[in-house]
Amino acid sequence: PVLSTISSLDADSEADTLTLSGGQVTLTFNGPIAGEIALRAQDVTVFDFTLATQNNIEIKNLRFFATSSNHTDTSEGYPDFKVWDVEKNAVITSAVDLTTTSTSQTFTDTIQMSAGESRRFKVTVDGDADNDNGDSIDVALLAFVAGDIKNLDNNTNVAVADIVPNSTLDGNAMTVQAPTITLE
């Protein structure tokens, strides 16, 4: 057994303090962990996040950046890139096809949230049949800018300093894997 060398917390050096603080709008990255996308798969989750708000708000823009690798021809890509409300199992943005290796995508579909509400969202893509084993996609939610989120309680824009964290939330690489079967 491992025995403790500290029997009581009687000095500052024996304790740590952790302060967590949210903003008027708080973002949380939920995943997924790095994984695989099957060829011809539909609605594969490539980014999952939660938004929580103190006030009634309207989100005017969601900005994403998608990076894909190992594309060998122009027919490869990730079609049907869109955002869902996870709890409602409903698509909340228009869908776009990602056909280049680096793509910025801003969704301008308006999302309203009530004060005290926390909502989980996910970004999905389809696995294009032309993709090769080893092709991958990595999605990031870009930082909000002034005017992206409006506080409906006082009819002003939420200051970017009140969005926590207001930096890029990077997702994990999702790699194309062709299905295989082994018979013995």
Question: What positions do the PLM features span?
Answer:
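Exposed, polar/acidic Ser/Thr-rich sequence context and nearby capping/turn residues
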Residues: 1-184
